[in-house]
Amino acid sequence: MKKFGKKVVLVGDGSVGSSYAFAMVTQGIADEFVIIDIAKDKVEADVKDLNHGALYSSSPVTVKAGEYEDCKDADLVVITAGAPQKPGETRLQLVEKNTKIMKSIVTSVMDSGFDGFFLIAANPVDILTRYVKEVTGLPAERVIGSGTVLDSARFRYLISKELGVTSSSVHASIIGEHGDSELAVWSQANVGGISVYDTLKEETGSDAKANEIYINTRDAAYDIIQAKGSTYYGIALALLRISKALLNNENSILTVSSQLNGQYGFNDVYLGLPTLINQNGAVKIYETPLNDNELQLLEKSVKTLEDTYDSIKHLV
């Protein structure tokens, strides 16, 4: 691979993509930011809008409209393009139509001579990230999904509101599928080293509050989609966080969608787990200790993803 730099190409200039572009320009994380979308007039307008305000970015950044050949020397290609999730529709129900869209995009990116990292956000993200890895033949550490990074942020936010602390003081994760089979790792969730689950149970006299927090985390996207059509600010900031960890060689641990290689006894499947992210990609999955119930829920999540992936294997 070439020397790691800071050129990012975004494929997909819808609500998620444009929100991510704005966040990236605001933070000045990339030196060059390229946007690709079939809606070329929209891209041109967004490029102008972003460049007009780039003076006030934290560091210089050039934004431009591009084509797939721009991926040739990109360090990171972020794919947000895909059919949106409709009210009442699960992420897994999007699978076949978005797999076909993804195949077209990834083929065009690879035809450019691309030799960088993929960051996938289109849903169902765990399935599509695995699909991109299989189609491209790239090493697993260079094909990363947004996973449960946003879910974990939602989880930490809801806990923080309940306990009256900042989100950054809450150490807790959502793992598994970015979707209905995701699970909360209550056995490890803590604030100041004290169990969140036990604290909630002591304060309320039951586990109802913990269950409510989990359900509100899991179903957050459905509520937002019902009210305003789609989610985009939260996932855009999650993508920003992952991009920053990659581009700035942070050695940060984030619950991205990574490919399992023996962890918890599973192989090949992609799902959200605490993963070390640096300039070499998703370099290490941390096998968080889980209790028996959590292990059963993880197995269920893996089975859900495996069954769904089997349904689109013919498209590889």
From Swiss-Prot:
Q: Where does beta-D-fructose 1,6-bisphosphate bind?
A: R156, H171
Pathway assigned in UniProt: Fermentation; pyruvate fermentation to lactate; (S)-lactate from pyruvate: step 1/1
Residues where NAD(+) binds: V16, D37, K42, Y68, G82, A83, S104, A121, A122, N123, S146
Q: What class of enzyme is it?
A: oxidoreductase
Q: MF terms per GO, please?
A: L-lactate dehydrogenase activity
Q: Which residues carry this modification: Phosphotyrosine?
A: Y222
Q: Which reaction does it catalyse?
A: (S)-lactate + NAD(+) = pyruvate + NADH + H(+)
- Activity regulation (record text): Allosterically activated by fructose 1,6-bisphosphate (FBP).
Q: What does this chain do?
A: Catalyzes the conversion of lactate to pyruvate.
> Quick check: keyword Oxidoreductase in the entry?
yes
* Alphabetically ordered keywords of this record: Allosteric enzyme, Cytoplasm, NAD, Oxidoreductase, Phosphoprotein
Sequence positions that bind substrate: Q85, R91, N123, P124, V125, D126, D151, S152, A153, R154, T231
Q: What is its EC number?
A: 1.1.1.27
UniProt record similarity statement: Belongs to the LDH/MDH superfamily. LDH family.
Subunit structure, interactors included: Homotetramer.
* Entry's localization field: Cytoplasm
Q: Provide the Gene Ontology terms for cellular component.
A: cytoplasm
- Spell out the protein name for this chain: L-lactate dehydrogenase
What species was this sequence derived from? Staphylococcus epidermidis (strain ATCC 35984 / DSM 28319 / BCRC 17069 / CCUG 31568 / BM 3577 / RP62A)
InterPro entries under this entry?
L-lactate/malate_DH, L-lactate_DH, L-lactate_DH_AS, Lactate/malate_DH_C, Lactate/malate_DH_N, Lactate_DH/Glyco_Ohase_4_C, NAD(P)-bd_dom_sf
What gene, per UniProt, encodes this protein?
A: ldh
User: One biological process GO term for this chain?
Assistant: lactate metabolic process
Catalytic center residues: H178 (proton acceptor)
